[in-house]
């Protein structure tokens, strides 16, 4: 549709199923005309989802992927892609972690979200964040927050509500919750 043609979208991608879902959603958005960039915080993204996203024109940066085609980690290039996105604003899909993750985000993921977190709280920043299943870095079952988390404007979760979507302090980082 014409209303999304060229709209900037940033995918924050981890190695689990949420990362795969994020890549697949990004491929659909790119196919629909959005300008989609994926930044990987893993050296092991879901291979089928990654290929699907790339086949639909998603630009990929991060672990194992660089814009020049080299197959090595370039965190500086991935962070630069996040900063370039931030200069335009748009939609972020947070698929860094899911229900299998525990503890705070790993350093590579923290580096990717740092410029976005610094941009401000939901409603006060030039972007909107949709968390895939849960805001990455929140305690899935108990709602703990042990490190930086990119606060979502909306969290789209699957099957049922998780503890982090209902319990403080994580609940305050979820935005509107859709099951």
What residue ranges belong to the model's regions?
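YjeF_N-associated NAD(P)HX repair module
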Residues: 89-179
